[in-house]
Amino acid sequence: MITHLKNWPRLLNRFVLQLKNARHSIHQFTHLAGRLQRPPKSGKSSRDPYLVTAVQGRSKKPRYPGERANQRFGEDSWFVSSTPLAEVMGVADGVGGWRDVGVDAGRFAKELMTCCSGQTQRSGFDGRSARNLLIAGFQELTHREQPVVGSSTACLATMHRRDCILYTANLGDSGFLVVRNGRVLHRSVEQTHDFNTPYQLTVPPADRQDCYYCDKPEMAVSTRHSLLPGDLVLLATDGLFDNMPESMLLKILNGLKERGERDLLQGASQVVEKARELSLNATFQSPFAIKARQHNVPYSGGGKPDDITLILASVEVPRA
């Protein structure tokens, strides 16, 4: 994500010395990692549907130490959580403009996902409102004794097992797809203030409580969709959607012969690898290049190098 921050002069002065002393590597480094999420073996009805989930991602720049363990791909973050009542997953994309003032742009996204994941383990959480989960997670983050300064988009999805209904909340330009029988059944809609300036949750510095883009979690678009066994649910940051057309994404997903854990991981890996390849292609007419032209924004064309995070899940039912 490339978003310009405005009206932060005091913050800029505070961190300018850090920026002068920082050493930046100019070579490009990408990292691929995957994770399989198995259904819980206890705490739920043996007849309830569940999600088999794979996570893949690439960071476009050198990783921070311990990034993989911290569930980060560059400035993106994610989480997957299972409870007796629901399956939950989320992605967040830290606003890159904070790098210009010496702030780790990915930390805010990581801490937001950590708070949302923690909220799923609280009593009373039933997975029927992804937006309420986002609200609760953001409130927890903003009430920390030591503020985590930054901004990020967020996309959360919860599947209530008994109802087999997917509840989503999307704020910004990350998003989700529901695929059934080879076709996109539902797709999220971007929320943007302007071209390449998505809605974003923000915690400003203590001395700058007025902020330029301080959107509220209540502004997230909330949807619900009935799911069937075999449906695919995909969550991703804009590093995927800005570089890969929907038709190309479907071609890869429709090539999955099975929906087992390793099959999903292989499919997710293929999607991420292809998106990364397209992001580095200077002549490919990417979705990002097309949007730039539609907004009369000068852009030479090609993909948009960015962090990519993808969660791919399949709806399954226990075998008798």
UniProtKB/Swiss-Prot annotation:
Q: Describe the location of the PPM-type phosphatase domain by residue ranges.
A: 49-315
Name used for this protein in its record: Protein phosphatase PTC7 homolog fig
For biological process, the GO terms are:
dephosphorylation
Q: According to its UniProt record, which cofactors does this protein need?
A: Mg(2+); Mn(2+)
Sites where the protein binds Mn(2+) 2? 93, 238
Q: Per UniProt, what is one Pfam family of this protein? A: PP2C_2
Q: Could you tell me which InterPro entries the record lists for this protein?
A: PPM-type-like_dom_sf, PPM-type_phosphatase-like_dom, PPTC7
- What's the EC number here? 3.1.3.16
- Kindly state one GO CC term assigned in the UniProt record: mitochondrion
Task: Say which domain of life the source belongs to.
Answer: Eukaryota
Positions annotated to bind Mn(2+) 1: 93-94
Per its record, the protein catalyses:
O-phospho-L-seryl-[protein] + H2O = L-seryl-[protein] + phosphate; O-phospho-L-threonyl-[protein] + H2O = L-threonyl-[protein] + phosphate
Q: Which UniProt keywords apply?
A: Hydrolase, Magnesium, Manganese, Metal-binding, Protein phosphatase
One GO MF term: protein serine/threonine phosphatase activity
**UniProt record similarity statement:** Belongs to the PP2C family.
